[in-house]
């Protein structure tokens, strides 16, 4: 278990440090404000740019970066521009889930699944790209329909935020950009993530040492991941695998995805993935079907993923009220469409 979980934890810690320091350098603030300038006062244009930004951040820096760091930026921007904030709130949380299929680094569940892809001698991206694109397009279409009135609005273009330290800003932005090609190069993702984190820590140690604190390390999340590994391993050894194999079946990918989605919404997507991995590890397509369920299908309940819980906390801080019911009814529209559409694309 140690050989499998150690690279995952190294990546998790490194990418969190990178995202937090990039946020401190105002990379995300500037990106959001530049989007507002490029959109030239049209909300629909601004929304499409936020969609692109949320998708890119999720794919390269993981769903937590989108849900936790981009959300407060776009919510504050929405309030300043007098745009209803729920449009951007749901854009970030939904794309944090549905845009997290493409690369192994996009979601912790994908990183865990990478072990099985190596065992099966299969290329992750070769199997994931079609359902990943389908999931993003379906999400964008549903958002456009649900928030069509807000998308017709206009706003006054805001000033670009002041950057205190351009060396930190460009250094952080450069690391974020370079991580993209590094993550798809075939190198173990823990290495470029660790290198990027070390570069930024060194840069901040020289120019802004006060930003370096132990709270940058996601200690609680690391402990949670280790505890879940141990707990699910124990339950699997005592009959859980047989029960899930009966429920999910052995041949229908949509049934597997639906079972995974149900489990994610009941108990969180990480334990749902860990519990169901032995049911899906026969081939690469079943593994991606499982990931579709736990990544894209976890958007019915506020506890469906850790990223959603953190996103809700950011919404509360920004005084954007998201009740469990408002999240559920919108999720009931998106989830069946995105899960079914992604499974169809997987087999296309």
Regions found by a protein language model. Give the residues of each.
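Juxtamembrane and boundary regions of transmembrane helices in multi-pass small-molecule transporters
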Residues: 83, 122-166, 303-348
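Hydrophobic mid-bilayer segments of alpha-helices in multi-pass membrane transport proteins
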Residues: 5-17, 168-178, 187-204, 217-230
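Flexible interhelical linker loops that connect adjacent transmembrane helices
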Residues: 33, 146-173, 207-217
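Alpha-helical transmembrane segments
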Residues: 4-16, 123-141, 286-300
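Alpha-helical transmembrane segments and, especially, the helix-loop junctions at the ends
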Residues: 58-68, 85-119, 140, 267-274, ...
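Membrane-embedded alpha-helical segments and adjacent helix-loop junctions characteristic
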Residues: 1-83, 214-283
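Membrane-interface alpha-helices at helix entry/exit sites of multi-pass transporters
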Residues: 41-49, 79-92, 119-130, 283-295, ...
